[in-house]
A protein has these predicted regions:
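A compositional/biophysical signature of low hydrophobicity enriched in polar/charged and small residues
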Residues: 1-76
Length: 76
């Protein structure tokens, strides 16, 4: 199944709200809060790579408090 890991950089204090919102998205299978340059890692899976890209572009990147993302497409 097509998937990607998305590293999210968030506004300070918005992490828990973003994690809650991510867990409510059907395409998001796992969410981790991490320390370092990025604050959250989300695993996105869907039936097609186009749907994965659409989810990242229109859902994850538009969540309130998300400052930037880095997407890692899984190849195998």
């Amino acid at each position: 199944m097509p998937s990607a890991f998305v590293l999210l950089n968030t506004q300070i204090g918005r992490e828990e709200n973003i994690i809650r919102d991510l867990k409510n998205l059907e395409e998001v299978k796992e969410v981790f809060r991490v320390y370092g340059v990025y604050d959250i890692i989300a695993k996105v899976e869907s039936g097609t790579m186009d749907k994965v890209k659409e989810t990242i572009t229109w859902k994850l990147r538009n969540l309130k408090g998300v400052k930037s993302t880095l997407t890692l497409i899984v190849t195998k």
